């Protein structure tokens, strides 16, 4: 079974993330969406909230499993029995960092490849941080996220 891991903070999961996963399942038998703990960032949603939202958004895709993780990504990928790490590249500016990360991961685990997918055109400009900012200022995020995510964003903003 060919397995890939698609890691990210998914804070929150966007239509761009969702699109990449739905395209990836055409390439792999199974895709593990790995929701990162993200110690260096201060996530808007907790790990449990991000995992739950991501599971709900992708519930209709049987080849997808959503898991939270902390620690080294490449170790998590190996534990999943995956052959590849999937990364999305929205712009050339993403490439430099992703290229370095891919090189380090290859050095640590030479048998695991990194594959880059570009987003579908309508999602190239979407980022989770932009979505959060738009939502916090009362803007409409429904074109950019699943309705469940839009609802959770507004609930979370009201709580804070």
From Swiss-Prot:
Catalytic activity: (R)-4'-phosphopantetheine + ATP + H(+) = 3'-dephospho-CoA + diphosphate
Entry keyword set: ATP-binding, Coenzyme A biosynthesis, Cytoplasm, Magnesium, Nucleotide-binding, Nucleotidyltransferase, Transferase
GO cellular component: cytoplasm
Enzyme Commission no: 2.7.7.3
Cofactor(s) for this UniProt protein: Mg(2+)
CDD domains: PPAT
Gene name as annotated: coaD
Cited HAMAP family: PPAT_bact
Family: Belongs to the bacterial CoaD family.
Residues that, per the record, bind ATP: 9-10, 17, 88-90, 98, 123-129
Protein function: Reversibly transfers an adenylyl group from ATP to 4'-phosphopantetheine, yielding dephospho-CoA (dPCoA) and pyrophosphate.
Keyword Cytoplasm: yes
Pathway note: Cofactor biosynthesis; coenzyme A biosynthesis; CoA from (R)-pantothenate: step 4/5
Protein name, UniProt field: Phosphopantetheine adenylyltransferase
GO MF, one annotated term: ATP binding
Binding positions for substrate per the UniProt entry: 9, 41, 73, 87
Provenance organism: Thiobacillus denitrificans (strain ATCC 25259 / T1)
Subunit and partners: Homohexamer.
PANTHER family the record matches: PHOSPHOPANTETHEINE ADENYLYLTRANSFERASE (PTHR21342:SF1)
Annotated compartments: Cytoplasm
UniProt key word Lipid biosynthesis: no
